[in-house]
């Protein structure tokens, strides 16, 4: 068996990489992009389903219209222009995939490119609104033993 090894075949196998095909809850990406809002509602989780049932109001629809316009105006094989929004409670729908959104964190707009893995999540999940705590040394009065730490 060892003498049947062919270097050309091994190189060809290495070139032919297989990527994991994306699916959201058992629905392929191509089929996901073709879903209507009613069909999408049946696929997403309960919290998103409830939000979709209540209807997309003026502001979320306005964001989707801006994203459509940005995608339409973009040149082929290029990212669309940034669309800024304060709508952190907007659920990512398949139509938004490939768009670039500036999500407001309360201080600044964080630029995020929407990927297929983000479908069903809220926009706010991708723009952190607080600065994570970096724990340093305890201050004076933090514990009883800190009374014996000499002052600098």
UniProtKB/Swiss-Prot annotation:
<dbReference type="InterPro" id="IPR002222">
    <property type="entry name" value="Ribosomal_uS19"/>
</dbReference>
<dbReference type="GO" id="GO:0022627">
    <property type="term" value="C:cytosolic small ribosomal subunit"/>
</dbReference>
<dbReference type="InterPro" id="IPR005713">
    <property type="entry name" value="Ribosomal_uS19_euk/arc"/>
</dbReference>
<dbReference type="GO" id="GO:0003735">
    <property type="term" value="F:structural constituent of ribosome"/>
</dbReference>
<dbReference type="Pfam" id="PF00203">
    <property type="entry name" value="Ribosomal_S19"/>
</dbReference>
<keyword id="KW-0687">Ribonucleoprotein</keyword>
<dbReference type="GO" id="GO:0006412">
    <property type="term" value="P:translation"/>
</dbReference>
<comment type="similarity">
    <text>Belongs to the universal ribosomal protein uS19 family.</text>
</comment>
<dbReference type="InterPro" id="IPR023575">
    <property type="entry name" value="Ribosomal_uS19_SF"/>
</dbReference>
<dbReference type="GO" id="GO:0003723">
    <property type="term" value="F:RNA binding"/>
</dbReference>
<dbReference type="GO" id="GO:0000028">
    <property type="term" value="P:ribosomal small subunit assembly"/>
</dbReference>
<keyword id="KW-0689">Ribosomal protein</keyword>
<protein>
    <recommendedName>
        <fullName>Small ribosomal subunit protein uS19</fullName>
    </recommendedName>
</protein>
<dbReference type="InterPro" id="IPR020934">
    <property type="entry name" value="Ribosomal_uS19_CS"/>
</dbReference>
């Amino acid at each position: 068996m060892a003498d049947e090894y062919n270097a050309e075949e091994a190189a060809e196998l290495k070139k032919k990489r297989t990527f994991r095909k994306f699916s959201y809850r058992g629905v392929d990406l191509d089929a996901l992009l073709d879903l209507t809002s009613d069909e999408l509602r049946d696929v997403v989780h309960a919290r998103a389903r409830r939000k979709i049932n209540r209807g997309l109001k003026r502001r979320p629809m306005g964001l989707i219209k801006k994203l459509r316009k940005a995608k339409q105006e973009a040149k082929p094989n290029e990212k669309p222009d940034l669309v800024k929004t304060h709508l952190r409670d907007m659920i990512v729908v398949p139509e938004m995939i490939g768009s670039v959104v500036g999500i407001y964190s309360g201080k600044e707009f964080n630029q995020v490119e929407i990927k297929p893995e983000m479908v069903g999540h809220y926009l706010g999940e991708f723009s952190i609104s607080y600065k994570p705590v970096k724990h340093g040394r305890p201050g004076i009065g933090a514990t009883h033993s800190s009374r014996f730490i000499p002052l600098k």
